[in-house]
Curated annotation (Swiss-Prot):
Protein name (database record): Cycloviolacin-O4
Modifications after synthesis and translation: This is a cyclic peptide.
Signal peptide positions on this chain: none
Pfam families: Cyclotide
Species, as recorded: Viola odorata (Sweet violet)
Keywords attached to this entry: Disulfide bond, Knottin, Plant defense
Lineage: Eukaryota, Viridiplantae, Streptophyta, Embryophyta, Tracheophyta
GO terms of biological process kind: defense response
Length: 30
């Protein structure tokens, strides 16, 4: 539930390496 400061509209979350996932076009962690 914490925003990772990254969007995932066109590309996947690069921050997925630290546990972020795409939700509603924004990358979130928990």
């Amino acid at each position: 539930g914490i925003p990772c400061g990254e969007s995932c509209v066109w590309i996947p979350c690069i921050s997925s390496a630290i546990g972020c996932s795409c939700k509603n076009k924004v990358c979130y962690r928990n």
